[in-house]
Amino acid sequence: MDVKDGFYIDVGANDPIEMSVTKWFYDQGWHGINMEPSEEYFRKICEARPRDINLQQGAGKKRGQLKFYEIPETGLSTTDGETASRHRTAGFRVEEKEIEIVPLKDVCEAYAQEHEIHFLKVDVEGSESDVLTGMDFQRFRPWILVVEATLPNSTVLSVDWDPWVRSQDYDFTLFDGLNYYYVAKERAQAFGARLAVPANIFDGFVQASTVQLTQQRDALEQKLAQMTQTLEQMREEMKRCREECDETQMNDTGAFRLKGAILE
């Protein structure tokens, strides 16, 4: 998007770097709101996103307290009991705690009244419907909306909320295998074509994991080059020491012979 100083909202922000869909925006100078109830990931977000508004809360239909099923060190934590049960059966460790739930419209009322919302992402592992219906899309109009559209950790579609989103004057543009993408009708002419197809071979994109491996390789190669240089310097120093030692030994031998000749 050709937008400078843009504003985003990331509901279910999770890790601020790994697999984050808003990291690139932040790196370009954007800022926004991150909602993440997990203590582990909330700390990471606060450290990595000092310009953002970071809220350790969940989003839902109405204000209140809700049971949160946290699955440590994963992006699978959820407020949906059924989803948590499936993860527990699959062998994941599930920790339960109460968290504060706030409707997304209230969050926007408090923090986004003076901002044009350019991008809204919702990824809450099975509770997307509650988050979306807690938003006032007539008052607050994100240009682009991205919502996780499959059952957690699967490729099975789960989009019961889709008709409601479309009823809020949003056009569906594409499914990338994980998320549904929408554009506000009033922005369709500007952005609809750009979001007609997912990232593909013609984009020349590189997966984040490949970038990370490349960076790790480059760092190791640099370290190896430094170690090789140090080793070469040590070899040169050893050679110099040997030469000095040999010269000293020769001088000592010559002096000894001279002394012997004099004594004779």
What residue spans do the PLM features occupy?
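Phosphate/nucleotide-binding beta-alpha loop and adjacent structural elements of enzyme active sites
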Residues: 1-264
